[in-house]
C-alpha cells in the first residue's frame, strides 16, 4: 500500500480537521444553517449538466437530511419488518446551494468551510470547484481562502450517499445501515464559515502523563514564517469538579521556520485525575497574543492493561458496557448535540454502565465530549463489518484514511481509550496488523484490537492486539471457549450456558479466559429477546415509521391473542431481566474477565427487529426493572453469591460462597458483608463476614446452614449487604418438602389417550395426560428455557442454511401464580430458575385450532413471526369431565 501517513499530511493543506475548540474573539464565524436551495440528482448527471451554475426550484432546511425535508421517493411498502421504515428514501447525489456574504473585515483572513458530518461531497464557489472530500467519521473542511473575497458569493455543495461510499460500508456498517442510522443524504451538525488570521493554531494534542502530573503538548501552527520573536502561552484549569485546580501558565518562544512544537506542561502536584468515577477535565488554552487562541479539553488519565485486566490511573477497573448501533428513531441519524449524548450516558450510568462500544461506526465530537463529562470509556470503530482484505485496495485506502482522521480528530478526549478496526472481520491478518501499527504510531493514547469478534473468536488472541472483544477465545469443545452465556443455536449447542445448564451461580468463563494473555471483553453479551410493546408505536413521530410493529400487532390480532400483547411483553421482559442478570454476574464471577458489552440495554430496531433491550429504542424505560434494582448486579461494587443450585429441600445443608466484585475507588477491607436468608419477614439464618483488602474479585467467606423442614414449598430470599454503603444484592431460593407423597386419588394418570382414558372421561372421571414426546412432534415447537436469542427470523434462516436445528423460538411462559395448581410450586407470572427442568425438557403444544378465547394455565409466549398459541399446562373440559394436559 502507499505511504498513507505522507498522503494524509498532504491532504491537511486542503482539508483541515481540528479538535474540539472554542471560537474566540480572534476567530470569526458565519453560521450556514437555515434555508438552502435544493435539487435531487438521481441519475448522477448533475456535474455533466453543470448544476453548480443553476438555481434550484426546491428548498430544504439544513442541518438536516432528505428524510427530514421529505425529499426523495415516498415509501409505500408498509409490510417491511426487517427494520423501521423511512417515509422518504433516497440514494444518490443531491445538490445544496445558497448565497453567502463575506464581511469586509475578512479580507486577507484564512477562511474555512466546516461541515461537521455529511457524506462524500464536492464544493463549488461561484461555479469554481474547490475540492472533494469523502470523510464519513470526521468533519469535512475546505480551504476557501483563495475563493472568497469580501462580497456576495454562491456556495454549492453536492452530497452523494450512493456509490461514492464503498459498497461494503454502505450495505452493512452502522455508519450507513438501514437497520438503524439509515443511509441518509444531507449535512448534519455544525455547518459554518470560519475566519482566522493567516497565522493560527492548527491543532493541539495533549498527551497526559499521570506519573509526574503533566501533559506533553504538541502544537501545530498554520505556517512558520513571520513568527520569530512571538510567544505562545499555555494555561489550564479543571472546570467540572468540586475540587478546582488551576495550573500555572507557561510561556514559550516561537522560532522562525518552525511550525511544530512539543512542550512538557506541568499541571502541578495537586492536579486532578480523570476516571469513570471522577471524570475531572481540564481546559487547555494555547494563545499567541493578539493573533490566535485555541482551547481543547483533556483528562489527566492513564488507561492501561495489567495482565488480563484494564487499569485506570493504576487501579484495576472493569468495563460494564453496552453496544451502540446509532439508534436514533426520530432523525434516522446520529445525535449531534451535547445534551442528547449527555442524556444517553447519564442513563447508562443509572444502569451501572461505564463503557460503550460503537459497532462499526464512530460517533461525532458531541458524543466524546459527553462521555468525557459523564465518565464513560469509549470504543469507536472503523465503519466496516465483514471482509478486511488486501485485494480490496480501494476499501482499504478509504478505511485507512478514515482511521487516521479519527485519531487526529478525537484523541484528546479522555473517554477515547479503546479502538477496533470494525466488527466481526475476516480476511488478512497482516493487513489488520498494518492498520493497527499505523494507528498506534500516530496515536499511542489508545489500546488497540484488530476488530471486535474477528473470525467470530475462533482464532483467539492474535499477536499485536492489546485486548480482545470476543464471544469465544479460540476453538474448543463444548462451551470451554465461550466468553458469554448465550448464543444462537447456529453458533452453540442448545444456545450456550444459560439455556443448557442446570441453573446455578457457580459457572464462569475462567476456562476460556485462561487462553488469552490480554484482557477479554465479552462481545455482544445477552441478546435476550422480549415481546414488543405496541404502546411504543406512538413515539415514532420522526422520519421513521413503526410499520414493523403494525405488522406484528396485526399478526397477533389474527391469531386471536391481541389482548394478551401487554402480558406477553411484561412476562418475557421480566424473564429477560433475570437472564441479563445471570449473564452479567457470570462475567463478574470470572477472575480474568475484563468487561462485557451488552447487546443491549436498548432495543435494536433492525435485522428483523430485535427487541432485546431493557430500554426501548429511545433509551426510555420499558418499566421492566428499576435502575436501582439493576445496579444491584451491575455496578462498580457487586456482592455475589455462588451456589450450586437455587432449588433446595427442607432439612438439606445449604452451602454458598460470598464474593465481592470490587472495582470501586478504594479497598473495602474496613467494611463487612452481612447476609440473611428470609422467608417473607421470617429470618431463617444470618451472619456477617469481613471483606478482604484490594480490588477485583474477592472471596469474603462461606455460608452454611441447615434449611428448616417444610410442609409446603416456598420461595425464600438471600440478601447480601455491604455495611455503610448502598451496595446490596439478593438471590431467590426455592425450598421444597424433602418428601411429599402424592396420592392419585380418583385421577387417571396416562401417557396416551387410549380407549380406557376416553371411557374414564365419558364417565365423569378426572384425567392427567402427559403425552409422550414422540406423539407430539407434529404439534410442538420444542422447549426453550431462555427467551429466544436476538430474533427468530434471522437465526432460523441461518440454521436452515447450515442445516442445524433451529431454536424453538419462544419467549418464556405466562401464567397466573394464584392458580391452585401452584399451591405446592411457588411461581411468578413469568419464567424463573425453578422452571428449568420442566421447560427445558418440555414440548409445548400448538393450540391454534382451539377456540380463540381459550387460554392455557401455563402459556408459552411465541415470537412475532409465528404467533402460535402454545400450551405447556392446559385444563380442558371433555365430555363434561376434566382433562389436565401437560
PLM-predicted stretches and their roles:
Residues 123-125, 214-253, 261-263, 652-690, ...:
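Beta-strand-rich binding/interaction modules
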Residues 746-792, 805, 880, 886:
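Short alpha-beta junction capping motif
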Residues 500-504, 796-884:
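Catalytic beta-strand/loop cores that center a nucleophilic Ser/Cys/Thr
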Residues 27, 205, 285-348:
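N-terminal carbohydrate-binding accessory modules
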Residues 17-78, 154, 158, 162-165, ...:
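Accessory carbohydrate-binding/adhesion or oligomerization-edge regions at the termini
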Residues 345, 355-614:
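Substrate-binding/catalytic cleft of secreted carbohydrate-active enzymes
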Residues 149-152, 222-304, 709-741:
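Extended acidic/polar, glycine-enriched regions
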Residues 39-43, 71, 86, 91-200, ...:
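Accessory beta-strand-rich segments of carbohydrate-active enzymes
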